[in-house]
UniProtKB/Swiss-Prot annotation:
Its main location: nucleus. It comes from Mus musculus (Mouse). This is Pseudouridylate synthase 7 homolog. The keyword Flavoprotein does not apply. GO terms for molecular function: enzyme binding; pseudouridine synthase activity; RNA binding; tRNA pseudouridine(13) synthase activity. It is found in: Nucleus. GO terms for biological process: mRNA processing; mRNA pseudouridine synthesis; negative regulation of translation; regulation of hematopoietic stem cell differentiation; regulation of mesoderm development; RNA splicing; tRNA pseudouridine synthesis. Residues 76-99 have a biased composition (Acidic residues). One of its GO terms (cellular component) is nucleus. The modification Phosphoserine is found at residues 7, 126. Residues 22-32 have a biased composition (Basic and acidic residues). The lineage of its organism: Eukaryota, Metazoa, Chordata, Craniata, Vertebrata. CDD domains: PseudoU_synth_ScPUS7. Residues 369-579 form the TRUD domain. It catalyses: a uridine in tRNA = a pseudouridine in tRNA; uridine(13) in tRNA = pseudouridine(13) in tRNA; a uridine in mRNA = a pseudouridine in mRNA.
């Protein structure tokens, strides 16, 4: 039976997306995956803009010369700002919560970013992914197909771990003092442990126990008033822990400790920064396959260079909303993008659909899938969409780039951002506007700092102060906007079947569907390009639609190379329809809107029984499980089920009604 498409005619709101993403360089060659047929299109999807430890400096225009003194000053400024901003996060979160609903009144809708078609013809219904992040759980799927779970908190024993008697020679008080010394939690520079039964064997065991259990500490024996003491200390002060390569490391271990990170309501980079601070190491010794967003419970694999499992396990005593486990030692780190995808468990509360509607919707999702649109978080949550900034970059309209980022905007923001924008509009003085920002690591602060350093006539270099992945986010957003719009046009014109002139991939090579082989393909094989200098376009009406859309934005589809190499994008290919794997669902009845409707990994570790549901209840919820390849958006799958607008602007209205 031929599938038909359904246009979006109803406005509502549902969910905040928590899809995982993997930042990559857009200019890399196309790579094939089921979701997006390149590793270069994932961009930076999280709402927050994060500093990278390894970010290169600004792209240089022809007239720009590297300035080592400025670079050193920048590092010093950033270190001072990190200390300055430590106490600001909680207050900022409170203010953000108060202004969120107002801010969303000025946000985007799906229609604004080209999202307007559906696959299934079933009747839509409403449902809410509540503000509770626990209704959205993401488990990473490795290349081997294994779904990451936190189900083991034990520490592996290797050949060079201390013998059992070494673990008993230190009292609980000794261990606490040594741990505080190791993590610089007290002002002491050493810890002295008296040797009660003074024998060489006993002293040796204590030395071994301290060095094994507390890497980074050195020991020596001292005589004090006729008594023997083992004294533990940092060999090189605070720098000792900053370079784990200098620590003693058992030869039997791989250099990397792999572990499962379970986190609640915290994005991956924030979690790694927390671990780094506790361990007193740089964030860049951690590696991972993809980042997971904040508003969810997520489980993923992390690797860290030469930090012992025992030391990581100790952190479970003091971490909030984070838990580490499933430790193992491996020879290699993890690589970005080296994952098969993610498994989602999603609860949609207070659904209005009948059991028959739910059945039709979920069967369609399992059998046909959903349109592989870029989700709403790709385009930002404020009155200035990220794709508008990206378009200005591609147009070389640098004054417009500066204005779009810094100008006052409708909708509520954090108070200090409002004051900063007002100061900028009034004075056009970057130094003066920068003083209004207590948090200077935001994109506005980074741009203002660049303008202060390079001047108003060198906006290119000033913009280059912003970390590279965050700069590329803007142009990826524009590409995504074009792709969404063109896919909607393609489905409007030709429906959900392959036609001659469509593109498919043979391996990594794009090829056209011809008249005589159209029956050899399905809609799931069809790809469409993101605009760039190294892609081809369909051989039908949609090719001209691409050209017209870019021309309307003063861009030449035949000349997508930019004068600045970073902004020259090769393009990529992306499947237009995705069929989720491992799809299952159930409708449950409940009375209390606050109760959890399934167990998390931590619940299972703690032995909590799974929730029991009554046959009838005040409300009904749809619990969905499904797996998606990388670079696909779970909200777009949920949108297909509900037939509703997933923009936060619409979601805010529905959630407000639900909470009354």
């Amino acid at each position: 039976m031929e599938m038909t498409s359904t246009s979006l005619k109803r406005g509502c709101l549902v969910v905040e997306d928590n899809d995982s993403v993997t930042p990559h360089d857009e200019t890399k060659k196309q790579k094939v995956s089921e979701g997006c047929l390149t590793s270069s299109q994932d961009g930076v999807e999280n709402d927050g803009l994060h500093r990278s430890e390894n970010e290169p400096g600004p792209p240089e225009a022809e007239s720009t010369v590297k300035d080592d003194e400025n670079s050193s000053a920048q590092v010093q400024e950033e270190e001072e700002e990190e200390e300055e901003e430590d106490g600001l996060s909680e207050a900022g979160e409170e203010e953000e919560a108060e202004s969120f609903a107002d801010m969303m009144k000025h946000g985007l809708t799906e229609l604004d970013v080209g999202i307007c078609k559906f696959v299934s013809s079933h009747h839509g219904f409403s449902g809410i992914l509540k503000e509770r992040y626990s209704d959205f759980v993401v488990h990473e799927i490795g290349k081997d197909g294994r779904i990451s779970h936190l189900d083991d908190l034990s520490v592996p024993v290797d050949e060079e771990d201390p013998p059992e008697d070494a673990l008993t020679v230190l009292t609980a008080e000794d261990r606490q003092q040594l741990e505080e010394l190791q993590l610089f939690k007290n002002k002491e520079t050493s810890v002295a442990i008296e040797v009660i039964e003074d024998t060489k064997e006993k002293r040796t065991v204590i030395h071994q126990a301290i060095k094994s259990l507390f890497p980074g500490l050195e020991t020596k024996t001292e005589d004090r008033e006729g008594r023997k003491y083992i004294v533990a200390y940092h060999a090189a002060g605070k720098k000792a822990l900053a370079n784990p390569r200098k620590h003693s490391w058992p030869k039997s271990r791989g250099s990397y400790c792999h572990f499962v990170l379970y986190k609640e309501n915290k994005d991956t980079m924030d979690a790694i920064n927390v671990l780094s601070k506790y361990l007193r190491v740089k964030p860049n010794i951690f590696s991972y396959m993809g980042t997971k967003d904040k508003r969810a419970i997520t489980v993923q694999e992390i690797a860290v260079l030469k930090i012992s499992a025992q030391r990581l396990a100790h952190l479970n005593k003091c971490l909030m909303n984070l838990k580490l486990g499933n430790f193992s030692y491996q020879k290699t780190p993890l690589k970005l993008g080296a994952l098969q995808g993610n498994h989602f468990t999603v609860v949609l509360r207070n659904i209005t659909g009948t059991d028959e509607q739910v059945q039709q919707a979920m069967q369609s999702l399992r059998e046909t899938g959903f349109i592989n649109y870029y989700g709403m978080q790709r385009f930002g949550t404020t009155a200035v969409p990220t794709y508008q900034v990206g378009r200005a970059i591609l147009q070389n309209s640098w004054t417009e780039v500066m204005d779009l980022i810094l100008k006052p905007r409708s909708g509520a923001e954090k108070g200090y951002l409002v004051k900063c924008r007002e100061e900028w509009a009034k004075t056009k003085d970057p130094a003066s506007a920068l003083k209004k920002l207590p948090v200077k690591r935001c994109v506005e602060g980074q741009l203002l700092r660049g303008l202060s350093r390079y001047g108003m006539k060198n906006i290119v270099s000033a913009f280059g102060i912003i970390p590279r992945n965050n700069r590329l986010m803007y142009i990826h957003s524009y590409q995504s906007y074009v792709w969404n719009t063109m896919v909607s046009r393609r489905i409007e014109e030709y429906g959900l079947r392959p036609v001659p002139g469509d593109l498919v991939l043979k391996g990594a090579t794009p090829t056209y569907i011809e008249e005589d082989d159209v029956d050899n393909y399905s809609i799931h094989d069809v790809v469409m390009p993101l605009p760039g200098f190294d892609v081809i376009y369909p051989k039908h009406k949609i090719s001209e639609a691409y050209r017209e859309m870019l021309a309307a934005d003063n861009l030449d589809i035949d000349n997508m190379r930019h004068t600045i190499r970073d902004y020259s994008l090769s393009g990529a290919y992306r499947r237009i329809i995705i069929r989720p794997q491992s799809v299952s669902w159930e409708v449950v009845a409940y009375d209390d809107p606050k109760i959890p409707l399934f167990n998390t990994d931590v619940d299972n570790l703690e032995g909590k029984p799974p929730p029991v549901f009554a046959s009838e209840g005040k409300y009904r919820a749809l619990k969905m499980d499904f797996s998606l390849p990388p670079s696909t958006y779970a909200t777009m799958a949920i949108r297909e089920v509900l037939k509703m607008d997933t923009s936060i602007k619409n979601q805010t209205q529905l959630n407000t009604s639900w909470l009354r």
